[in-house]
């Protein structure tokens, strides 16, 4: 039976490249000279600046570099800024994988449209199976058209 997996993966290498490009752009910006910096750790980035408006500009720089590297900014989880001595810091975490709530929402969408496919939650991915390849392509088109708050990829398509 044909099947495919719905996953939400983050390309860590492209994320690292985007952060490195943001650091280079930060060095070139005259208005952000001083105590502005990006610190990348695994799947999170810490923004440090002297004022809140600088953090907003740094966040825009990071978003633009993510878009250039084709990393979807929907996976960004921006936390509130907090003061740390004379500087202000802000955490940006990058989410990966499909959580239970989103998986249930995906399965519910597929069942609601009464497509001739079955969806099953398997950890951090959703496996969709059906008798015909066309039904699976219809399910992919349905999920691409919905705004679910996380970037979705469709992998492991088998006939």
Curated annotation (Swiss-Prot):
One of its GO terms (molecular function) is nucleotide binding. SUPFAM superfamilies: YajQ-like. Keywords: Nucleotide-binding. InterPro entries: DUF520, UPF0234-like_C, UPF0234_N, YajQ-like_sf. CDD domains: YajQ_like. GO terms for cellular component: cytosol. Nucleotide-binding protein. PANTHER family: UPF0234 PROTEIN YAJQ (PTHR30476:SF0). Belongs to the YajQ family. This is Nucleotide-binding protein PSPA7_4966. It comes from Pseudomonas paraeruginosa (strain DSM 24068 / PA7) (Pseudomonas aeruginosa (strain PA7)).
């Amino acid at each position: 039976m044909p099947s495919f997996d719905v996953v939400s993966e983050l390309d860590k290498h492209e994320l690292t490249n985007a952060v490195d490009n943001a650091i280079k752009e930060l060095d070139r910006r005259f208005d952000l000279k001083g105590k502005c910096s990006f610190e990348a750790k695994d799947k999170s980035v810490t923004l440090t600046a002297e004022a809140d408006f600088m953090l907003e500009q740094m966040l825009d720089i990071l978003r633009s570099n993510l878009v250039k590297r084709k990393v979807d900014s929907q996976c960004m989880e921006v936390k509130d800024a907090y003061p740390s001595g004379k500087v202000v810091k802000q955490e940006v975490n990058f989410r990966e994988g499909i959580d239970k709530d989103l998986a249930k929402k995906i399965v519910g969408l597929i069942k609601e449209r009464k497509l001739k496919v079955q969806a099953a939650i398997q950890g951090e991915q959703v496996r969709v199976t059906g008798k015909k390849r066309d039904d699976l392509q219809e399910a992919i088109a349905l999920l691409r058209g919905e705004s679910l708050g996380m970037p979705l990829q469709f992998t492991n398509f088998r006939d």
